[in-house]
Amino acid sequence: MSQLVQFIDGQWLAGAGKPFESKDPAKNQVIWQGEAASAAQVEAAVKAARHAFYHWSDLALDYRLAIVRRYADLLGEHKEALALTIARETGKPLWETRTEVAAMQGKIAISIRAHDERTGTVENPMPGAKAFVRHKPHGVVAVFGPYNFPGHLPNGHIVPALIAGNTVVFKPSELTPMVAEAMLKIWQEAGLPKGVLNLVQGEVDTGKALAGNPDIDGLFFTGSSRTGHFLHQQFAGQPGKILALEMGGNNPLIVKDVSDIDGAVHAIVQSAFITSGQRCTCSRRLFVERSVQGDALVKRLVEVVGQIKVGLYDAAEQPFMGAMISEKAALGMVEAQANLQRLGGESLLTLTHLEAGTGFVSPGIIDVTAVSALPDEEYFGPLLQLIRYDDFDAAIDQGNATSFGLSAGLLGDSEADWQHFFKRIRAGIVNWNKPITGASSAAPFGGIGASGNHRASAYYAADYCAYPVASVEDSKAAMPDQLSPGLTF
């Protein structure tokens, strides 16, 4: 394994900080080792980005776009190798990591279109002059990436930031350093000038050094609510720096009067258990009516979820669920389930840690209807809380009884119920009769409350990657036709 794991000012360097490693959570094997970037190396990365900023932002947009498009082409050339790297480091099945790489490619054209539509140049009519609205890059921005989509989600910040003319210092999750290294090598192959994109690998100390660097102009973060809140506090009193936070959710999914039970169950499974429940949009709470139909749906759901195939990412017969990101994460889900049981929850399908040393768990469903003080927690794994209800409005109110507000959904045949639900539910992603995990890069992605800070990403990422500049212009200074009162020339 190479120890040259930091990419600073166009050079691969060994880290000068503490050693750390990455494990394949499905096979319990160390697959990456390196030393973290020291505070001095983080400072060097920021300085390199600052030095490269004017050169990069002064380049014609078409030149920047040519490099970004070349990156998209190279993603296609390296798609299978990159998909395998993501699978090895996250435990996700290959069928899913292949879709992640495809989403990374698709993000390029979407980001170019969003940049043009949302942050392009507009000329407004004005007598005696020209009026323009243009957009400028912020400068040096830090990007913090998560582990669940270690390619696609940081890509969703990095690509629009570079298109806009920013330079970037990227701090990936310490759980997925191998994916980050592979991404940077593809960018390097695409011909990105030195200093434009820098990689600082490491754990908490590296992240703190980057977030606290006084010379960054902004920080774009996707990850846990806990870390996002820490960053928000760290940036307090710095209104000149832009902070874009995309965090988690305690997402409600309500079922009411469905005619196709299997169709509803499929949407629930896709909402709660895809990616082993490790999507920020995954449903954490399922509301089902107390009725004969509701009983039938719950029974069918338990049957289907109990048959979900869990297995190795590279198995010939692909599983629906792979391993969670780590054994620690898997054991955390076991403990979360135990805590809900202590509070009065009844497991309908018990989540079980399947193999010591790995992130493999079976999916779980727990009825928490009887729990009077349900914790407002994002259980980031395949554990679905079931709540039975009698009144639709009360279910919506309970769905809104969370500090989060990322995603929500209704499964039901009545359009009137859908319209009512849409008006009342508080979330940034609200779906009807579709899984709540299928967000599109061609739409804004973000939430309210503890799920974000009103800086929606995906298609709206262009908005936080550049700031608007209004200009009134004429070719020369000239006397007006009429002077203001009190002036003599």
Swiss-Prot record:
GO process terms (BP): arginine catabolic process to glutamate; arginine catabolic process to succinate
Enzyme class: oxidoreductase
EC number: 1.2.1.71
GO molecular function: succinylglutamate-semialdehyde dehydrogenase activity
Source organism superkingdom: Bacteria
Pathway: Amino-acid degradation; L-arginine degradation via AST pathway; L-glutamate and succinate from L-arginine: step 4/5
Residues that hold NAD(+) according to the record: G223, S224, S225, R226, T227, G228
Key words, A-Z: Arginine metabolism, NAD, Oxidoreductase
Signal peptide: none
Residue numbers annotated as active site: E246, C280
Any one Pfam family match given in the protein's UniProt record, by short name: Aldedh
UniProt cross-references to InterPro entries, sorted A to Z: Ald_DH/histidinol_DH (IPR016161), Ald_DH_C (IPR016163), Ald_DH_CS_CYS (IPR016160), Ald_DH_CS_GLU (IPR029510), Ald_DH_N (IPR016162), Aldehyde_DH_dom (IPR015590), SuccinylGlu_semiald_DH_AstD (IPR017649)
Reactions catalysed: N-succinyl-L-glutamate 5-semialdehyde + NAD(+) + H2O = N-succinyl-L-glutamate + NADH + 2 H(+)
Record-linked NCBIfam families: arg_catab_astD, PRK09457.1
Purpose of the protein: Catalyzes the NAD-dependent reduction of succinylglutamate semialdehyde into succinylglutamate.
Family per record: Belongs to the aldehyde dehydrogenase family. AstD subfamily.
HAMAP family named in the record: Aldedh_AstD
Name by which UniProt lists this protein: N-succinylglutamate 5-semialdehyde dehydrogenase
Species annotation: Aeromonas hydrophila subsp. hydrophila (strain ATCC 7966 / DSM 30187 / BCRC 13018 / CCUG 14551 / JCM 1027 / KCTC 2358 / NCIMB 9240 / NCTC 8049)
Gene transcribed to yield this protein: astD
